[in-house]
Amino acid sequence: MSKIFDLVVIGAGSGGLEAGWNAATLYKKRVAVIDVQTHHGPPHYAALGGTCVNVGCVPKKLMVTGAQYMDHLRESAGFGWEFDGSSVKANWKKLIAAKNEAVLDINKSYEGMFNDTEGLDFFLGWGSLESKNVVVVRETADPKSAVKERLQADHILLATGSWPQMPAIPGVEHCISSNEAFYLPEPPRRVLTVGGGFISVEFAGIFNAYKPPGGKVTLCYRNNLILRGFDETIREEVTKQLTANGIEIMTNENPAKVSLNTDGSKHVTFESGKTLDVDVVMMAIGRIPRTNDLQLGNVGVKLTPKGGVQVDEFSRTNVPNIYAIGDITDRLMLTPVAINEGAALVDTVFGNKPRKTDHTRVASAVFSIPPIGTCGLIEEVAAKEFEKVAVYMSSFTPLMHNISGSKYKKFVAKIVTNHSDGTVLGVHLLGDGAPEIIQAVGVCLRLNAKISDFYNTIGVHPTSAEELCSMRTPSYYYLKGEKMETLPESSL
């Protein structure tokens, strides 16, 4: 016999939990949330809290924080700190254990939320669509496996997130994804991270800090410059600093196959014919919407050409009572975006307050070493959308690095504006503190701040952030898509 709910949510990630909690607490609806695992780790990895909590933002940020201490220890000598000769070494096992405990605490807090919230129920298993109003919960992902529960609902929300993409090459079974990287029993001595995106760059920094003596971190990317889609100046500077930190970056290289050596290490053959022997190959070539186990075909839910669930601006699918939010829609794969989408959906469906998520001017960060903060348009995109664009840029050595021994660690700040009216279209930062600074910048962009608002604001001294309040003269311009040092008088 079916259990009846107002809302059934498949997926207990950030967006699904936000939607379920809000529906139950704000609008007193009866809500069911389904997921395959309560606590983090193998075999399914994404448990209560979703990718972010279990195999994404949270554990990654903890591990990056740990990795930064390598430089802090080295740089402390410039500030008068001396060590008596006793060894300092990284303890990977201790890091992973501490990370696991922190993530488990969050898992348990969500368990408590379900136990303590009236009208909010959790079901363990694999949720899939039987009809447009019925969700079945099965023992496994196999659609022929035993049915544990049958849930009837007026509204169904798909929020199963995304999954690491693995390439179709021989020997891919010898490689890991970022999921497994969070649970490696030992730090790899020789590691190859494949991909030029933020996940590959972030893990390269983590592995580089914790590698055993004599270790080597290599990052390969199929194109000529990592971090496609980010500001080009920052991409170039990140490459310089990663290289200065000892990471080898192989551009225009892509693995063709991976085989095992007799000692268990991996032999990577690239499309160019080059080879590399490493202990771990981590694939980080992107993430794909996790739709394959939902049985969407049973009700005809449409997908986008890239495999995401097709939705409108209110997160509605083509089936009237079925919705989708978060990574599964392949709109903007960021945790705060999924949370906002979940809250907006519940307000729309149950609160009679139609609301949609604004996917523009969303601040985000890359927790690489050095870190990146970005919000709004990069200059190439702005130049296509606006006739006249002015770019303000500054690159400098932060005060601390004048004595830290790391003068190569430049801070880069760039402001992209519509030169016709001064509106700030994008801000891009590289260096210590960039992720923290960019959050406040995001508020400015949402308020349609102008460049004059920035330079007329008194900065906090001495900080890197004050540079945003110091740039009064454009570094260069774009006119009808063409880059130039100065604008012709006729266009002024």
Swiss-Prot record:
<dbReference type="InterPro" id="IPR001100">
    <property type="entry name" value="Pyr_nuc-diS_OxRdtase"/>
</dbReference>
<keyword id="KW-0521">NADP</keyword>
<keyword id="KW-0285">Flavoprotein</keyword>
<dbReference type="GO" id="GO:0045454">
    <property type="term" value="P:cell redox homeostasis"/>
</dbReference>
<dbReference type="InterPro" id="IPR046952">
    <property type="entry name" value="GSHR/TRXR-like"/>
</dbReference>
<dbReference type="InterPro" id="IPR012999">
    <property type="entry name" value="Pyr_OxRdtase_I_AS"/>
</dbReference>
<keyword id="KW-0963">Cytoplasm</keyword>
<feature type="disulfide bond" description="Redox-active">
    <location>
        <begin position="52"/>
        <end position="57"/>
    </location>
</feature>
<dbReference type="GO" id="GO:0004362">
    <property type="term" value="F:glutathione-disulfide reductase (NADPH) activity"/>
</dbReference>
<dbReference type="GO" id="GO:0034599">
    <property type="term" value="P:cellular response to oxidative stress"/>
</dbReference>
<dbReference type="GO" id="GO:0005739">
    <property type="term" value="C:mitochondrion"/>
</dbReference>
<comment type="subunit">
    <text>Homodimer.</text>
</comment>
<dbReference type="Pfam" id="PF07992">
    <property type="entry name" value="Pyr_redox_2"/>
</dbReference>
<dbReference type="GO" id="GO:0006749">
    <property type="term" value="P:glutathione metabolic process"/>
</dbReference>
<keyword id="KW-1015">Disulfide bond</keyword>
<dbReference type="InterPro" id="IPR001864">
    <property type="entry name" value="Trypnth_redctse"/>
</dbReference>
<protein>
    <recommendedName>
        <fullName>Trypanothione reductase</fullName>
        <ecNumber>1.8.1.12</ecNumber>
    </recommendedName>
</protein>
<feature type="active site" description="Proton acceptor">
    <location>
        <position position="461"/>
    </location>
</feature>
<dbReference type="InterPro" id="IPR036188">
    <property type="entry name" value="FAD/NAD-bd_sf"/>
</dbReference>
<dbReference type="InterPro" id="IPR004099">
    <property type="entry name" value="Pyr_nucl-diS_OxRdtase_dimer"/>
</dbReference>
<keyword id="KW-0560">Oxidoreductase</keyword>
<keyword id="KW-0676">Redox-active center</keyword>
<dbReference type="GO" id="GO:0005829">
    <property type="term" value="C:cytosol"/>
</dbReference>
<feature type="binding site">
    <location>
        <begin position="35"/>
        <end position="52"/>
    </location>
    <ligand>
        <name>FAD</name>
    </ligand>
</feature>
<comment type="function">
    <text>Trypanothione is the parasite analog of glutathione; this enzyme is the equivalent of glutathione reductase.</text>
</comment>
<dbReference type="GO" id="GO:0050660">
    <property type="term" value="F:flavin adenine dinucleotide binding"/>
</dbReference>
<dbReference type="GO" id="GO:0015042">
    <property type="term" value="F:trypanothione-disulfide reductase (NADPH) activity"/>
</dbReference>
<dbReference type="Pfam" id="PF02852">
    <property type="entry name" value="Pyr_redox_dim"/>
</dbReference>
<dbReference type="InterPro" id="IPR023753">
    <property type="entry name" value="FAD/NAD-binding_dom"/>
</dbReference>
<dbReference type="InterPro" id="IPR016156">
    <property type="entry name" value="FAD/NAD-linked_Rdtase_dimer_sf"/>
</dbReference>
<keyword id="KW-0274">FAD</keyword>
<comment type="similarity">
    <text>Belongs to the class-I pyridine nucleotide-disulfide oxidoreductase family.</text>
</comment>
